[in-house]
Amino acid sequence: MIKACHERIRIHCHSLERLGTYLEFIGCNESAQRASGDIIRFFDIAVRHHFADEEQSLLPVLLEIGKKARVPLDKAMGALQSDHLELNQTWSGLRANLQKISTGQFMHLDFLEISHLNKKYHDCLIQEETRILPFAEHYLHRRQLDELRAAMIARRAIR
């Protein structure tokens, strides 16, 4: 599930970039408003769940395994949580403008903000995919994977 979410994050980062260009050349029409709303929903819901999956479910299990295997993961895990915090802060600034675009009240996105967010996501995903996920794939057992999957599904359950 985490790898699939990473791919969707990449797709939505690209959509955000395309929306910025679209607004510059076409303007804020219904298509831009709809795209803006879709991007907001994805980052507000799916990414929030994804961060919770990692921070509340995956990382605690990996830290415990790391201690037993004598593999120091504290620094990598701390960096990941710090990255998530910075991503959330950067997203907040873009979100306010996207919200205005979704209602036709705003016509422009800051390409530097988009670029910063996309680069930060790219760097974070690369770190996860080259350091954290290989460790998880090597050390997690079927039962642990099933428990993590169940927690992820429960997090997404409609309430």
Where are the regions that the model predicts?
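Small-residue-biased structural context
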Residues: 1-159
